[in-house]
């Protein structure tokens, strides 16, 4: 494709600078087309690797799971959006041993406290408490961190942003008392019992019963993670599961660029197994920040 575009441009009198730009612009669709063709070829040569799973009626107490949404609280309106989003995910995944939490920071700032911070935090706490009154007392949580001074960035911000929130939350689940989560709303007594976390972005939807299905996969004996004491990493089984992530029809139609890179959109109820090139070839994939992981 690139060679054809270059030859066409040269025949029609394009100069070298313009020819270079044409080649560069052609590389984007050409690379995407090449990737799609290679993945389709591999999917025909190697069948999708389907992981064994348990057909669970509900999440067992020994596999208590919490869905976490790391995010930024920058307004009261944003708090309302997040609370509504969390409630929708919970209604699609009803289970007494499945919980939902917001892990939040304030936006980066040049000062430690901004006007309106207290109002936002009060609204967030009230929203989580209202959800617990409406549904169950141990269903929803809020874990919020105040800003810390970052010498390198020259800003007041949440420590290590998203990665820091998740890392500190894992420590909090294992009884750490020195995290920067200064505001904790919800029934904290269940935290030591949490075995798995499902991390989502604030714009990610969790399909109906998807959490239970993920737990059914990770708890299957053949999938349980084995950590090599010498290497200090998982050498057998899986410590992280990442389900297929697809783009909604509305998001894919947002622009030509989105249409090009969104791939298969929506949810296909008739698909039983989906090919992933890395998983099918190597038995492992690339984690993009959305999925289930074993806390331990």
Regions found by a protein language model. Give the residues of each.
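Hydrophobic alpha-helical transmembrane segments
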Residues: 7-29
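Membrane-water interface at transmembrane helix exits
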Residues: 9-10, 38-43, 215
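Transmembrane alpha-helices and immediately adjacent membrane-cytoplasm interface residues
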Residues: 22-47
């Amino acid at each position: 494709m690139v060679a054809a575009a270059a030859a066409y441009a040269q025949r029609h009198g394009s100069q070298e600078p313009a020819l270079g730009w044409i080649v560069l612009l052609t590389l984007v669709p050409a690379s995407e087309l090449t990737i799609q063709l290679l993945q389709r070829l591999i999917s025909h040569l190697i069948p999708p690797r389907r992981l064994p799973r348990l057909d669970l009626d509900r999440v067992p107490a020994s596999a208590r799971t919490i869905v976490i949404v790391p995010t930024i609280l920058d307004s009261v309106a944003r708090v309302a959006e997040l609370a509504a989003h969390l409630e929708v995910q919970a209604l699609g995944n009803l289970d007494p041993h499945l919980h939902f939490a917001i892990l939040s920071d304030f936006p980066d700032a040049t000062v430690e406290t901004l006007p309106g911070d207290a109002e936002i935090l009060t609204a967030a706490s009230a929203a989580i408490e209202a959800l617990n009154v409406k549904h169950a007392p141990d269903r929803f949580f809020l874990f919020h961190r105040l800003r810390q001074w970052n010498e390198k960035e020259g800003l007041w911000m949440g420590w290590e942003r998203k990665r820091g929130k998740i890392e500190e939350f894992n420590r909090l689940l294992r009884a750490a008392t020195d995290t920067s989560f200064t505001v904790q709303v919800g029934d904290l007594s269940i935290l030591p019992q949490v075995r798995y976390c499902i991390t989502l972005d604030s714009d990610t939807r969790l399909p109906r019963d998807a959490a239970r299905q993920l737990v059914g996969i990770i708890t299957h004996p053949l999938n349980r993670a084995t950590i090599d004491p010498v290497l200090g990493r998982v050498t057998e089984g899986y410590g992280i599961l990442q389900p297929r992530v697809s783009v909604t029809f509305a998001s894919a139609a947002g622009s030509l660029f989105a249409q090009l890179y969104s791939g298969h959109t929506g949810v296909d109820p008739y698909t039983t197994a989906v090919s992933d090139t890395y998983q099918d070839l190597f038995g492992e994939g690339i984690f993009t920040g959305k999925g289930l992981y074993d806390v331990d």
